[in-house]
């Protein structure tokens, strides 16, 4: 984007003075609008936000975090629109991404608030580390859940084959009851809660 200039009126028609307009001005306006919209309901007023603008270090930190928040919010909205109509083989990947985006947005909400009340400052390197941590954690959790699901399916198929293909063996040996985690057994509370979380994103 090129530089913008504003012409200053002068009594001398042969001499024109120009003043460069910096992009930081529009970024600061965006940040002020964002903070006012998001935190007015929490009791942070426009005058409070303007006071933060005078604190250059705090405002600089807020300016660093805002682009990441806006980018993640756009990605979250895009995934949310695609989730309902996407092919089944794509849905699992989108569910992972929307969970990551939601977690990042929630965390950045806390970061904004803590910066606003002066609890701490955060640099761009720390934010990038935070994003990488979420990416790793959420992917790992999803992979673990998929492995657990595959184990469940394998157990169910094994039990079905034993009872349907060789019912006499089952009747004589009681092998079905001896198998761990029978189909009729209720799932553990932790696994049920995890599956419920995933199902919530698919609705």
UniProtKB/Swiss-Prot annotation:
Lipidation positions, renumbered (S-palmitoyl cysteine): 4
Gene Ontology cellular component list: host cell Golgi apparatus; viral tegument
PTM per Swiss-Prot/TrEMBL: Phosphorylated. Palmitoylation is necessary for Golgi localization.
Family: Belongs to the herpesviridae UL51 family.
Organism the protein comes from: Human herpesvirus 7 (strain JI)
Principal subcellular localisation of the protein: virion
Complex and partners: Oligomerizes. Interacts with U75; this interaction mediates U75 incorporation to virions.
Keyword hit for Phosphoprotein: yes
InterPro entries linked: Herpes_U44
Keywords, ordered alphabetically: Host cytoplasm, Host Golgi apparatus, Lipoprotein, Palmitate, Phosphoprotein, Virion, Virion tegument
Coiled coil: none
Superkingdom assignment: Viruses
A Pfam family hit: Herpes_U44
Functional description taken from the UniProt entry: Plays several roles during the time course of infection, including egress of virus particles from the perinuclear space and secondary envelopment of cytoplasmic capsids that bud into specific trans-Golgi network (TGN)-derived membranes.
Name of the protein this chain belongs to: Tegument protein UL51 homolog
Location of this chain's protein in the cell: Virion tegument; Host cytoplasm; Host Golgi apparatus
Keyword Lipoprotein tagged: yes
